[in-house]
Curated annotation (Swiss-Prot):
Highest taxon in the source lineage: Bacteria
Gene Ontology molecular function terms on file: DNA binding
Species annotation: Pseudoalteromonas atlantica (strain T6c / ATCC BAA-1087)
PANTHER family xref list: SUGAR FERMENTATION STIMULATION PROTEIN A (PTHR30545:SF2)
Classification of source organism: Bacteria, Pseudomonadati, Pseudomonadota, Gammaproteobacteria, Alteromonadales
A Pfam family it matches: SfsA
InterPro entries linked: SfsA, SfsA_C, SfsA_N
Family designation: Belongs to the SfsA family.
Protein name as annotated: Sugar fermentation stimulation protein homolog
């Protein structure tokens, strides 16, 4: 996934009210940028971090910048914008870069499904395969060398697990794909210490046949691409 506009470098001053960040640009100007990440962002929003913003010329927007990338004080690259995870995976599906999801004739994004009126991130279809429902989650939480999801309690995530498990029970294929946007994460584990209910539902989903994949990303100020499969600690 390429950034169409050149990103603007700066230094993070602070993140506040979940969706706002103060950033000092390299020319000394201080701007307020939109933070497109609703999670706790533990370790991903430390003052003094090097950050990159995407500019917007849309006059209807209140804020002229969006926070896209960061580099931790330990030197790890992070994809801040969780909306990019679906774009990264969409590109990987289009180029057949995910070995476990190859061989499907069509890829449809944002398809309604299930009894709870959810939207699945991707529905893969083929005349010789059963439909495959793919839900994408962005992972950025690193604690003591281990990557975790979620970084905050997620009722929405619990709903997605219920729906994926239900699709498997109806005879379809369902995949939960963790898009790891943190260069320091080498494996992914469910954060039972943060959301025990999600961990319980995740175990049930795996038990009934929901498949789980975790992939790292190669991140720089020009683009983010899905890179290689990571161990998923279940």
């Amino acid at each position: 996934m390429q950034f169409y506009n050149s990103l603007i470098e700066g230094i993070l001053v602070k993140r506040y009210k979940r969706f706002l960040t103060d950033v000092t640009l390299l020319n000394g100007e201080e701007v307020v940028a939109h933070c497109p990440n609703t999670g706790a962002m533990i370790g991903c929003a430390e003052p003094g971090m090097q950050v990159w913003l995407s500019p917007s010329n849309n006059p209807k927007r209140k804020l002229g910048y969006t926070w896209e990338l960061g580099v931790t004080h330990q030197g790890h690259w992070i994809g801040i914008n969780t909306n990019n995870a679906n774009k990264i995976v969409a590109e990987a599906l289009a180029t057949h870069a995910i070995q476990e999801l190859q061989g499907y004739e069509t890829v449809r994004p944002e398809v309604r499904f299930g009894h709870e009126n959810s939207r699945i991130d991707f529905l893969l279809s083929s005349s010789d395969k059963k439909d495959c429902y793919v839900e994408v989650k962005s992972v950025t939480l690193l604690e003591e060398g281990q990557g975790y999801f979620p970084d905050a309690k997620t009722v929405r995530g619990q709903k997605h697990l219920r729906e994926l498990a239900a699709m498997v029970e109806q005879g379809y294929r369902a995949v939960l794909l963790f898009c790891v946007q943190h260069s320091g994460i080498q494996s992914v584990k469910i954060a039972e210490h943060i959301d025990p209910k999600y961990a319980q539902m995740f175990k049930h989903a795996v038990d009934v046949g929901v498949e789980v994949l975790a992939y790292s990303c190669a991140i720089n100020e020009q683009n983010i691409t899905l890179n290689q499969r990571l161990p998923m600690i279940v």
